């Protein structure tokens, strides 16, 4: 009986260690349709960027005058960014960073002075 038990145990261990755990994982993809928006009118407006991805993504933004319609998503999507009017007497610029599992894309936005 002990031999049968050991044989079964050995067979199970052999099968468990012989499994192929090297399943192919798709490469993470993150692309944007446009990454630079220069000299946006001082009255503000809206810009759109197409995001192409096969993963979840997030957006980091530190400018209160540049407002994305979403800060996270998954897969392909259209991002609309509202640019508020610039009433200051200086041009301004900011970067929005879109990240997906360690891959980053930067959207550079500059706006004319008021």
Please tell me what each predicted stretch does.
Residues 46, 50-80:
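Surface-exposed binding patches on compact interaction domains or structured appendages
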Residues 109-113:
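Interdomain boundary/hinge segments at the C-termini of tandem beta-sandwich modules
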Residues 102-108:
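Extracellular and select intracellular beta-sandwich modules with Ser/Thr-enriched
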Residues 84-90:
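Short, surface-exposed loop/turn segments at beta-strand-coil junctions that are enriched for proline
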Residues 1-17:
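Sec-dependent bacterial lipoprotein signal peptides
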Residues 38-43:
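Short, solvent-exposed loop/linker segments at the N-terminal edge
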Residues 90-102:
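A short beta-strand micro-motif common to beta-rich folds, especially ectodomain repeats
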Residues 13-37, 114:
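Bacterial Sec-dependent N-terminal signal peptides
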């Amino acid at each position: 009986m002990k031999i049968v038990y050991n044989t079964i145990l050995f067979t199970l261990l052999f099968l468990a260690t012989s499994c192929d755990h090297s399943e192919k994982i798709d490469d993470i993809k993150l692309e944007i349709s446009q990454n630079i928006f220069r000299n946006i009118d001082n009255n503000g407006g809206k810009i759109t960027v197409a995001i192409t991805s096969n993963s979840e993504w997030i957006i980091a933004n530190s400018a209160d005058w540049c407002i994305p319609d979403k800060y996270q998503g998954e897969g392909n999507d259209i991002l609309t960014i509202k640019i508020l009017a610039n009433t200051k007497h200086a041009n301004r610029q900011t970067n929005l960073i879109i990240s997906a599992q360690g891959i980053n894309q930067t959207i550079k936005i500059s706006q004319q002075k008021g």
